[in-house]
């Protein structure tokens, strides 16, 4: 009887946790989509200063010269 009670309580906790996380995930996804629709991507043309590839319009940043190529 004790084993059945433990299994039942574990199943209830897992079901509650799964339902709760699904609700939060949908809310986060909607919020993230709203933010992304407001943002515009700004990029640096070739020859401009950069620190990472995603800053360059052509998505290539030279690590040696720290410029977009």
Swiss-Prot record:
Keyword hit for Phosphoprotein: no
Position of the signal peptide: 1-17
Intrachain disulfide bonds: 43-57, 50-61, 56-68
Compartments where located: Secreted
Tissue: Expressed by the venom duct.
Propeptide stretches in the record: 18-41
Pfam families attached to this UniProt entry: Conotoxin
Example GO molecular function: toxin activity
One of the record's GO cellular component terms: extracellular region
Keywords, ordered alphabetically: Disulfide bond, Knottin, Secreted, Signal, Toxin
InterPro entries named in the record: Conotoxin
Major localisation: secreted
Note: This precursor corresponds to allele E1b. Has not been merged with other alleles since they may differ due to geographic variation (see strains in PubMed:19606224).
Protein name: Conotoxin Eb6.14
Organism field: Conus ebraeus (Hebrew cone)
